[in-house]
């Protein structure tokens, strides 16, 4: 099976996570094609890469399955990466590909976890597939991410929220800044990772990439919520989130379609604690005559 354009970034994410697994990293080069006995006992003809694909899935599940919060347990991580089982690739070049990723990307990344590596991969794969023009896919440039997080003026005590997380770039940037502010205090850094970074994402692929990204960047308990942040005020998840986590800073780059940016502004203001701060990229369309009233009302509410 050829890897679909929409799954290439997930495949790359899966390999990066699998390489985190010591057993997989040691054994993948020695994995062989299915034996005659395996073929004889299988209901279906097994592809040459069957055992390697299976090992990748097992390593992914082993690494990530128990490291997300209860809001996201409905995501079946084995199912999310299940397409890997059908990748029909000759074993030798397949293992060579993984080896190149390990040597040229994974190992350097282990020494410098600051990059939004999955976000960059997602952008590359989308552009090659000719899908980068989708207005609902917002890929924030690094310099904008750096600026917005600086404008948030984060402290080590802040609870940071992104209501349209994408691949998790803002949360990773915030995690890095807050971890530096902790000045080597391991207990404080652990608290930041475990309890102070939250994100909503409704797209399954982006959600999986964001969780994978946060995992790869050292946050083993990514507080990602699979769902729509534009939820009703009276809903259970809304009430529980606001009551429990009390976010002080919200950093977002919302989808640009129709009046979605304004809706995200209102929702962020509802979720933020009093005297909280919202940092947002707003498209110029929000200043035209059709949206200006909503924009003005949102500004008044923020005051």
Regions found by a protein language model. Name each.
Residues 1-28:
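Non-catalytic accessory regions of SAM-dependent methyltransferases
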Residues 6, 111, 115, 138-142:
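Conserved phosphate/pyrophosphate-binding and hydrolysis machinery centered on Walker-type P-loop NTPases
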Residues 17, 24-128:
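Long recognition/docking surfaces used for binding and targeting
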Residues 21, 229-230, 298-299:
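Hydrophobic pocket-lining residues within nucleotide cofactor-binding pockets
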Residues 134-262, 270, 275, 284-285:
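Conserved S-adenosyl-L-methionine
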Residues 267:
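Short, conserved SAM-binding segment of the class I
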Residues 285-292:
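Conserved class I S-adenosyl-L-methionine
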Residues 294-303:
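Single conserved hydrophobic/aromatic residue that forms the stacking wall/gate
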